[in-house]
Regions:
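Short N-terminal amphipathic alpha-helices
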Residues: 1, 12-15, 29-34
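Active-site-surrounding "flap" and adjacent substrate/cofactor-binding loops of secreted or lumenal enzymes
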Residues: 8-22
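Glycine-rich, mobile lid/loop segments that gate access to catalytic sites or pores
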Residues: 23-211
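Short glycine/threonine-rich loop-to-helix capping motif typified by GTGT followed
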Residues: 3-12, 202-212
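Short beta-strand scaffold segments in enzyme catalytic cores
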Residues: 1-2, 118
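Intrinsic structural disorder
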Residues: 1, 16-20, 188-189, 212
Length: 212
């Protein structure tokens, strides 16, 4: 669903843009139960009120106004170059590299688009990062190992085998690439052999994305 308001004389192909974005994210297969060519795209975008628009569009750009107001709050930190918390920055980096691996299609070929990550960092009493304690990576994947039969035990065995492969790939393929992409010595020093990895903690993540 595309919703909002705008005043413009330009033509925008909302259907095409929405489908291209969905395709770029990676939802391109019917087996995902949501894909770019067949999903419904509903537009609820309407023209902005002229009363609001008169306060937005001015002849003098220096007098350009705002049609509405809002209150936001937040903070910046000097932990990273983009002024975001280090734990969030690392989690984003993990997901970016994971998406790169999926798009390349050379290793971890079972990857599907949906994923999330969390990084827990230990700090000293002065607020300085000391070490990475825990990394969580949950990634959607194909059902790439089928059970030997219809029994619950066979299904559990297949799920455990898949989880073992995914965990091994996260630790030995994904994370080395993440670390190689970091060029800040202080950040690199936070990685250690005692990091606790939680990979797909629920055990299986085949159903995901909008369908999930």
């Amino acid at each position: 669903v595309l919703a909002g308001e705008v005043k413009t004389k330009a033509y925008v192909d909302l259907q095409l843009i929405a489908r291209e974005v969905i395709k770029k994210i990676g939802y391109t297969k019917g087996e995902y139960m949501f894909e770019s060519n067949s999903c419904g795209v509903l537009s609820a975008i309407h023209e902005q009120s002229p009363d609001i628009n008169r306060g937005v569009e001015r002849q003098d750009p220096m007098e350009q106004g705002a049609g509405d107001q809002g209150m936001m709050f937040g903070y910046a930190t000097n932990e990273t170059e983009n002024y975001m918390p280090l734990s969030l920055d690392l989690a984003h980096r993990i997901l970016q590299v994971l998406a790169d691996i999926r798009r390349e299609g050379e290793v971890m070929t079972y990857l599907r688009p949906d994923s999330k990550s969390q990084v827990t960092i230990e700090y000293d009493d002065n607020g300085n990062p000391v070490r990475i304690d825990t990394i969580v990576v949950s990634t959607q994947h194909d059902d790439f190992i089928q059970p030997a039969d219809d029994s619950e035990a066979a299904q559990l065995k297949a799920d455990e085998e898949m989880l073992g492969i995914i965990r091994n790939d996260v630790v030995n393929i994904l994370m080395p690439r993440v670390i190689a992409s970091i060029h800040h010595e202080k950040v690199l020093s936070l990685f250690n052999d005692n990091i606790k990895y939680h990979v797909n903690p629920t055990g299986k993540f085949v159903i995901g994305g909008p369908h999930g």
